Amino acid sequence: MQIRGIQSLYFSPTGGTAKYAKAMAAGAAEALACPAEVSSFTLPREREEERHFSSDELLIIGSPTYAGKLPNKILPEFQEKLRGEHTPVLLFVSYGNRNFDNSLAELLSVLRTNGFLPLAAAAFACRHAFSDRICPERPRVEELAEARGFAMRAAEALKAADPAVLEAASLAFTVPGDTEAPYYVPKGEDGAPAKFLKAKPLTDLSKCLHCGACAAHCPMGSIDAADTSNVPGICIKCQACVRGCKQGAKYFEDAAFLSHVRMLEQNFAAPEKENLYLSAF
């Protein structure tokens, strides 16, 4: 099958998913000897337009896992803004070393419904957005190289495949997970459900330079750029503002949220999960 271009798209508030999207784009580009365009689907302005992909393009797409599924506030954007035309796709999710649960299956279902042909998939354990104590060094250089090699092999198989065989392989391709399963319920240190849906970041005004970086990084556009201590919009707890503030001025102090973070650190810092690779070929 002839592929004329590669598109690599990612939702990545804290950067781990983006690293894998770029590594796999490079591997596929080398295998197919064609250009790869890497683009973000993270910020509101990057999700405004509907994106169409043709049958002679390869799409690589990745998202982090939130509570065992795709981020619930971003799921409608994936469903409504991505359109394929029998477009082959390599999909992946990242997760913070607890479990990717049903996120990979959900992403595959969305893409298949929207006209894509899923051919390969992966799940990557990354540094947890909530804590530097969970997989702080991941993705490691060797893991990105491994992902690049995976994409290269998938692209080579795609190049050699007959279109009819390709479509049949895609229809038979499955990944672990249940798209109908509910979201994971976060737990606190005591094992009880931790309810922090309404938690929002606070600002240490003694550190804040009013540079606006936190507002610029927010994937929901929820932080007031004129007064960054004001968060009138929805917070998805992605930590983009916390990690994007070089002064360390953004933080969370919600008791239930912090209890959940401690539970994760106590139970999921080790052992580190292995990355998962799956292929239809």
Segments predicted by a language model, with ranges:
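FMN-binding flavodoxin-like domain, especially the glycine-rich phosphate-binding loop
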Residues: M1-S8, T14-Y20, M24-P44, E49-P193, ...
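Short, flexible coil/turn micro-motifs enriched in small/turn-prone residues
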Residues: Y10-F11, K207
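Acidic, Ser/Thr-rich low-complexity intrinsically disordered segments
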Residues: G177-M220
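Iron-sulfur cluster-binding cysteine motifs and their immediate structural context
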Residues: T203-D204, L209-L258
